[in-house]
Amino acid sequence: MVKYLLFIIAMTCCLCCNSFHKYPTVKIRQSMEKDTLLKSFGFSYIDLKGYKIIHINKRTNCILQPLVPLNKGEDNYFRLRIDKDKNTVYQIDSILSVGEILYNSRTMGIIIPITKYQNADDFSTVGEIQYFNTDELLSDYIEKNLENSEAACFDNRGLFCLYMSADTLFAYNIPTKEKKSIFIFNNPMMYSVELKLKNNILTLIYYPNFVEDFSNFNSAKIITFNYQE
């Protein structure tokens, strides 16, 4: 009887472990691709009229704050501050643009995709994705070299961050801090704007080419994937 119980416990632990480490998969849905028009990518300095407050939960807010330029050419940057119970618990400086800030109530984690630099010659961008846990007040980098993208989202359980960097879709295991490529577009000129997961359909909005002026309408594409965990 004892051996049988130990066997059941071992099998349960094994299944949980496999589920915990198993990476999601995607399969492109043909014929769902279509053109759309977007006015901007993320939230940039030109959209910022003073302070902007983004409510995360009852105790936590994100505040976007313009930076006072010290030198000429530095007036396009702003600061992101996370306040909990009216106290600043985290801060990111020198932000050019921020994508959609996402909160997962199960894990109490926040995903913050940001752009820090745009090349003046080819308009490519470099940024990062940061993760912050509002309960434990711990931060981490999901991606330190985010290329031409602000598209990121949580999986259904809040254990993975799905995101685009350059022309590759990644799945990042937040607890183990490991990432894996799960789809490649083979289009080095694409710029990813938004990634959303709903009802096991993963939707990506992207520009097929780099865009110079993000304040005007630009032709973008929407493509969907069948998503499986």
Regions found by a protein language model. Name each.
Residues 52-55, 60-72, 106-122, 158-164, ...:
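Short beta-strand elements that form the blades of beta-propeller/WD-repeat-like
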Residues 7-9:
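Sec-dependent N-terminal signal peptides
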Residues 150, 154-190:
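Intrinsically disordered, low-complexity segments enriched in Gly and acidic/Ser/Thr residues
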Residues 13-16:
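C-terminal motif of bacterial Sec signal peptides marking the signal peptidase cleavage site
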Residues 1-4:
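Positively charged n-region of N-terminal signal peptides that target proteins for export
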